[in-house]
Structure formats: C-alpha cells, structure tokens
C-alpha cells in the first residue's frame, strides 16, 4: 500500500486510511527498494531496506497496540472479578499480545496454547498478525543472486515467520512485453533465471 509513511499510526500522511486498507487484506506483500540509482531519489535520502521495513513494522505495531489497549480496557474489570471466563481468557490473550508489541515485535510472533486463544486473537484482525512476504526490488545485475541489501534484509527477518523473494521490476516489465511463452523462456534463460519473479510470487 503506497504512501504509508512514518507517523501513519498517528494520522500522518494518509495514515489511518492506509492502515484501514491493510486491515482488510489477508496478507501483506511488502515491496522494498534494494538497488542504488542516483536518478531515483529515496524519500529518506538513502537506500536502506531494513530501515524502511522497520518504519512500516513500527507503524503497524503502534496501531495494533492502540487496538489491544482499547480491548484490554473493555474487558479488564470483568476479567478481574473472575465470573466471566470468556472475558478472563480474552484479557490473557490481549495481555500476551500487548507484551510482544511492547517489545517491538509483531503479533504473529505470539504462540497460543489453545484453539480458543487462537480464535480470540484472530477476531482482533491485527495488522501484524497477517502473514507477510518481503519483495526485494533489485537492479538487473542482482536479479539472480541478490545483493548486500537483500542479505541485510534476510538477516533482519531471520527470526520472523516471513518469506523473502527477489524481483527485478525492470526485468519483470520487459517480460510482460514479450508475446510468446517460448520467447519469454529464452529471455529468462539468457539472464540466468528459471522463472519470472511474478511466477515465483
């Protein structure tokens, strides 16, 4: 979702609208710039996909924390009295998620002990509980092996439950212009790829 910027969780840019759009998705495909090109300026002045990922992660986590805090406030009194078992279970689930978010991690890092806990967590539709795939947009020279930006991102997400795929958008646009399957296969073979990035996605 283009246009999501630092401060979106507080309404910066078109923040709340973008965050609402993300809430409606089944998964997040996060495209990150992983190439240098002096003709294409970066909004933060320097290419750093790890920083870019962390900015978006933080905005999503802050929005989820806002959601969790509101839910905790709603059920806390009932849970403390102890008469309402559903409220107590919900309070425990919300508290577990809150703890993870406060550590700067995503809700998908939380593991639950029962189907009931999983159900309560799913019903929150948290932004950071969605599956995520990071798409590294690289230059043509890095389409096969990746580059140092891709390596840095791989290191940054190694403990996340996330996928990384390397794509050269420029090559993908060239592939899209090729008419026949045979010509596409020949083109891919010439640049050392088995299949297009779109096919891998």
Which residues are covered by each model-predicted region?
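Structural and coupling elements of P-loop NTPases
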Residues: 1-201
